[in-house]
Structure formats: structure tokens, C-alpha cells
Curated annotation (Swiss-Prot):
This is Adenosylhomocysteinase 3. GO terms for cellular component: cytosol; endoplasmic reticulum; neuron projection. PROSITE patterns: ADOHCYASE_1, ADOHCYASE_2. The gene is AHCYL2. It catalyses: S-adenosyl-L-homocysteine + H2O = L-homocysteine + adenosine. Residues 2-109 are annotated as: LISN domain, inhibits interaction with ITPR1. The lineage of its organism: Eukaryota, Metazoa, Chordata, Craniata, Vertebrata. The modification N-acetylserine is found at residue 2. Pathway: Amino-acid biosynthesis; L-homocysteine biosynthesis; L-homocysteine from S-adenosyl-L-homocysteine: step 1/1. InterPro entries: Adenosylhomocyst_ase-like_sf, Adenosylhomocysteinase-like, Ado_hCys_hydrolase_NAD-bd, NAD(P)-bd_dom_sf, S-Ado-L-homoCys_hydrolase_CS. Pfam families: AdoHcyase (PF05221), AdoHcyase_NAD (PF00670). The keyword Isomerase does not apply. Its cofactor is NAD(+).
Length: 611
């Protein structure tokens, strides 16, 4: 099977073939064309149009940057450069055919002029079966063994997946690139995209007021002077603003991506152009993922003394490969529930040898990023990937933490019928009081249209659940890790995988039933769409302050354990974002502060308070 997209000139010839067997009167009655116009559109006697397009089977594919599956599915790919060929004829300007097959315009005074020709364009591609066991890396490339560490974004050999930037199949690891300063200490998809990425970063800066405020306040002092931060997070425009803020505060940074699909290539290029050693691109393989992390850590003459992690992969890699580095590392800042869980496991086993800050459970992360960010981005991710209408659809959301609450609220507001699964009786009661029906997954799995996981756990959706799903059920994950959906169980010979668009796979059973799997079970919003910049400003500011706190803390303040961000800093982060809304805080009087037993400047709530 092949798909062709043709230009207006080629499309204009379609009605000629259909009209050749009609009399002028029949054509006039059926298409509303004048008899003169029909006669003018008829093919010349003695043969077909010499410029008529060849049969589909004979047309060669046209190479170039617009070809390929991504281009064929892009709205721009089918854009018609001129007015429709089926437009009703103008009484003053009629189309005629030259004897050589070209078009002509007849003006009212009888003058005949040749119409401008459009170049015929074809975009053609053949159906290809996805090979999930094939890696794009060259034969002989060293493999960073899976046994060394299990990634929280384990790709399950997804390197063969198509990505949005697949026009250049050469791996960035095989390219020799330098920025304008002559540095090659980076690895990105294409350094030439830096200018476009810079514009995206500048747009993000407008929605990240707290980080910009930190830059201004740090002009006279550098609280991170001497800090060498190695980071592993999603590389987006918002992350770039954070990295450049850390640089303005005096830190040196090296960065890799925590998710193989969430990197914005143009932003990574802009950071590399600015002198940041960045090792990331969209669509990394499993080997690429660990290679990028290793390039950030294993550097001659440079050793990190701070870690900023999202998912725990960077921390785990250093523990496994370079444990001696922890002698100089002052602390770890972890953003996600998956990474925090791994830190608590290390602490429980007595293997956590530095202080760690749990940003995920800070108020400003839980109550804003997890709730409001997911409430908006879940709809965006589903709409971009599936074009689905939400009204009346039955959806089950696994987990009713802050992420689950945001997803449920958004879908309910769009008219969906929402079910919730939950293990915690407190969260379960909250779901019931919010108007959602609490169920077990196997009770509704046959009837729901969408399954969304947001638990931070593993194997929440098993092969048994997947087998029982209805045809065309959409399955996706809003948690950090790709372990919530048992995707590995779907990579069996009896099931067929078809990539239908970027980050969208149809998994087809032998009886013809199919499910729609989004982002191969990885984080939906950052893999398939984007997230609100303003909310990420809150999280990024929390991360920056956590790094400052751990780096400057006197010896002995923090032991080898996992800590929450001090309440005073949570309140400070929130206060930096209030001016955006022209919000004005009420101040306590001395009498009121004394009555409540509070400092007038905060903190205003005890650590045990639940917002």
C-alpha cells in the first residue's frame, strides 16, 4: 500500500478523467459548470494528457525533507498551494486547455494567457512493520548492559520507534558537531537548530517569573559558586531556563535526559550552543540513554558535587559505576515519586551516603505541578495523539493522588464518565466524595474507552487486563516510570505492532482486536505534547532552592537521609509567583501573630499541615 499527496495541478486533472464520458449537458447539470467550461476542460483529441500523473504503482517516491511517515501525517503535508481545482468557473475568466496539456486563462477581451503551473508533488511511503528488536546503533557499538541498572524509563528496545526528527537517520553519537565557540563537549540531534531553540527558551522565560527573579537577586552574589551540578531531567524549554538560572547563580552544569522521548531537540541544541554540555535527543535507544548519562558523569578533570535527578536513574548509575564520587557529592535533589521511592529504599538499606532533598513531596510540587499541570496536560496529550472526543467516553484512572485528581477533574469537566481505582482508603474516600465511582480495574476493563495510570507502581495494567480490553481502547500513563503498564508482555510473536503516528502504536491481536498504546507506556504529556510553563516555574524554582540549601548547608545540618524542603522555602516559592496575578497578601498584626504563635514573616503552617 502506498499513500500519495499531490499538488493542486495534479488534483485538477481528476475531474477531467471523470468528465470525458459525459456530455456537456450532463456535466452542466451534475457539476454546475457552464457548457463552455466543460468543453474547455475536455482532453485534446488524439490521446490523453501528456502531463497526467502516472498510475500510483508507477510513481516513484519523491525524496526530501518532507517525505516519510511523519510528513504524510502532518497537516502541512497535504496543503494545497493554489485554489481548489473544483472551483466553479468564473463568467469572466474561463479555464481552457492548451494543446500541449497545459492550462490557459481566457480574459473577457479574448486574450489567451498561460496559467502558472504548479509542480506536481508526491509523498509516498510503503507500509512497514515495526521491528522492536532492532537497534539503530551501529554493529559493534558497545552496549551498556541492562544488568548494570534498570532504567525508570526502560525502552524495551524501543530504539526502532519512529520519532519526530527521523529525517536524519544518523545517530548523534556518530556525528562530529561543534558550536560557534568551537566546543564539541555535547551530543545533540542537530546543533543548527539552536536559533529556533533559543526563541523557545525566551518564550518560556516570560512564564517563569520566579526563576527570573532569582537571577536578578543573584547579580551581586553567587550562592552556587563552585557548584558542579550533574542533572538528569526532561530537557525542555522550561528546563533550559532552570539550567541557565543555575549558571547565573554560579554553578557549572552537565545534563542528560531522564526520558528518551521528552527531549526537545531544538532546545538541547540551544543549550549546547550556549556552552552547556548537554547529551540528549528525542528518540534515544536504551544504549544511548545510558551513554548520555555516562558522558555527563565520567569526565576527565571534572567531578560533580551536586545531583539533580528525575526518576533516580542518574543517582543509581553513579552508585553502580562510580561510587567513589559520593565522597565529594554534597547532596541529591530528586523530583519524581519514582526517584524518591528509590532514595527511600537506599536509606532503608543503609546505602544512602549523602543527604537527599525530596522535592516531589514538597507542597509547591504536589499541590501545583502534580495537580494543575496534569489537569491541563492530560487533555492535550490525548487530543494530540488520538483526536478523541471526551464527552460520553468511559475512562478509568488508576490512582487518586494529586496526578490522578488532576486527570479525573479534567476528564469529568469534558463530559467523560470517570472511574477510579485506588489502594489507599483515604484517597479512595476523596474520590467518592468528589463524585467518582471507586472500582477494581477488572470490573470495568471490558467497557472503558481509555485507561490512564498514575500510581508510580509497577504492573498496574497487566497482560490479562490488556487481553480483556475492548477494541480500540486507549492505554496511557501519566506517571514518571514506564513500568505501570506491562508493555513487555505485549512484545510477543502473536501480536502485531503498527506505528500509526508519532508516539501512537496499534497493538493488534490475532482476532483483529487492537488497543491504542501511547508513548509506549511512558509519560504521556511530556512525550506527546507539552505542559504549562507557569506551573513548571514553581517546580523548577523549588529545585533551584533545594540545590542552594543543600550546597550551602553547614556540615551536620543534614545527615545521610531524605528530607523535605523547609516550609519557609515552600512559602517563598509561592510568594515569587503571586505578582503574576496581581495578588496582595494580608499581613498579620503583632497581636494576631502573638495569638497564633507565629512569626509575622512565616512560616505560617507547621510541617504536619496538609494543604
Amino acid at each position: 500500500m502506498s499513500v500519495q499527496v499531490v499538488s493542486a495541478a495534479a488534483a485538477a486533472k481528476v475531474p477531467e478523467v471523470e468528465l470525458k464520458d459525459l456530455s456537456p449537458s450532463e456535466a452542466e447539470s451534475q457539476l454546475g459548470l457552464s457548457t463552455a467550461a466543460v468543453g474547455a476542460m475536455a482532453p485534446p483529441a488524439g490521446g490523453g494528457d501528456p502531463e497526467a500523473p502516472a498510475p500510483a504503482a508507477e510513481r516513484p517516491p519523491v525524496p526530501g525533507p518532507g517525505s516519510g511517515p511523519a510528513a504524510a501525517l502532518s497537516p502541512a503535508a497535504g496543503k494545497v498551494p493554489q485554489a481548489s481545482a473544483m472551483k466553479r468557473s468564473d463568467p469572466h475568466h474561463q479555464h481552457q486547455r492548451h494543446r500541449d496539456g497545459g492550462e490557459a486563462l481566457v480574459s473577457p477581451d479574448g486574450t489567451v494567457t498561460e496559467a502558472p503551473r504548479t509542480v506536481k508533488k508526491q509523498i509516498q511511503f510503503a507500509d512497514q512493520k515495526q521491528e522492536f528488536n532492532k537497534r539503530p546503533t551501529k554493529i559493534g557499538r558497545r552496549s551498556l548492559s541492562r544488568s548494570i541498572s534498570q532504567s525508570s524509563t526502560d525502552s524495551y528496545s524501543s530504539a526502532a520507534s519512529y520519532t519526530d526528527s527521523s529525517d536524519d537517520e544518523t545517530s548523534p553519537r556518530d556525528k562530529q558537531q561543534k558550536n560557534s565557540k568551537g566546543s564539541s563537549d555535547f551530543c545533540v540531534k542537530n546543533i543548527k537548530q539552536a536559533e529556533f531553540g533559543r526563541r523557545e527558551i525566551e518564550i518560556a522565560e516570560q512564564e517563569m517569573p520566579a526563576l527570573m527573579a532569582l537571577r536578578k537577586r543573584a547579580q551581586g552574589e553567587k550562592p552556587l559558586a563552585g557548584a558542579k551540578i550533574v542533572g538528569c531531567t526532561h530537557i525542555t524549554a522550561q528546563t533550559a531556563v532552570l539550567m541557565e538560572t543555575l549558571g547565573a547563580l554560579g554553578a557549572q552544569c552537565r545534563w542528560a535526559a531522564c526520558n528518551i522521548y521528552s527531549t526537545l531537540n531544538e532546545v538541547a541544541a540551544a543549550l549546547a550552543e550556549s556552552g552547556f554540555p548537554v547529551f540528549a535527543w528525542k528518540g534515544e535507544s536504551e544504549d544511548d540513554f545510558w551513554w548520555c548519562i555516562d558522558r555527563c558523569v565520567n569526565v576527565e578533570g571534572w567531578q560533580p558535587n551536586m545531583i539533580l535527578d528525575d526518576g533516580g536513574d542518574l543517582t543509581h548509575w553513579i552508585y553502580k559505576k562510580y561510587p567513589n564520587m559520593f565522597k565529594k557529592i554534597k547532596g541529591i535533589v530528586e523530583e519524581s515519586v519514582t526517584g524518591v521511592h528509590r532514595l527511600y529504599q537506599l536509606s532503608k538499606a543503609g546505602k544512602l551516603c549523602v543527604p537527599a532533598m525530596n522535592v516531589n513531596d514538597s507542597v509547591t510540587k504536589q499541590k501545583f505541578d502534580n495537580l494543575y499541570c496534569c489537569r491541563e496536560s492530560i487533555l492535550d496529550g490525548l487530543k494530540r495523539t488520538t483526536d478523541m472526543m471526551f464527552g460520553g467516553k468511559q475512562v478509568v484512572v488508576c490512582g487518586y493522588g494529586e496526578v490522578g485528581k488532576g486527570c479525573c477533574a479534567a476528564l469529568k469537566a469534558m463530559g467523560s464518565i470517570v472511574y477510579v481505582t485506588e489502594i489507599d482508603p483515604i484517597c479512595a474516600l476523596q474520590a467518592c466524595m468528589d463524585g467518582f465511582r471507586l472500582v477494581k480495574l477488572n470490573e470495568v476493563i471490558r467497557q472503558v474507552d481509555i485507561v490512564i495510570t498514575c500510581t508510580g507502581n509497577k504492573n498496574v495494567v497487566t497482560r490479562e487486563h490488556l487481553d480483556r480490553m475492548k477494541n480500540s481502547c486507549i492505554v496511557c500513563n501519566m506517571g514518571h516510570s514506564n513500568t505501570e503498564i506491562d508493555v513487555a508482555s505485549l512484545r510477543t510473536p502473536e501480536l502485531t505492532w503498527e506505528r500509526v503516528r508519532s508516539q501512537v502504536d496499534h497493538v493488534i491481536w490475532p482476532d483483529g482486536k487492537r488497543i491504542v498504546l501511547l508513548a509506549e507506556g511512558r509519560l504521556l504529556n511530556l512525550s506527546c505534547s507539552t505542559v504549562p510553563t507557569f506551573v513548571l516555574s514553581i517546580t523548577a524554582t523549588t529545585q533551584a532552592l533545594a540545590l542552594i540549601e543543600l550546597y550551602n548547608a553547614p556540615e551536620g545540618r543534614y545527615k545521610q537521609d531524605v528530607y523535605l524542603l523547609p516550609k519557609k522555602m515552600d512559602e517563598y516559592v509561592a510568594s515569587l509567583h503571586l505578582p503574576t496575578f496581581d495578588a496582595h497578601l494580608t499581613e498579620l498584626t503583632d497581636e494576631q501573630a502573638k495569638y497564633l504563635g507565629l512569626n509575622k514573616n512565616g512560616p505560617f503552617k507547621p510541617n504536619y499541615y496538609r494543604y
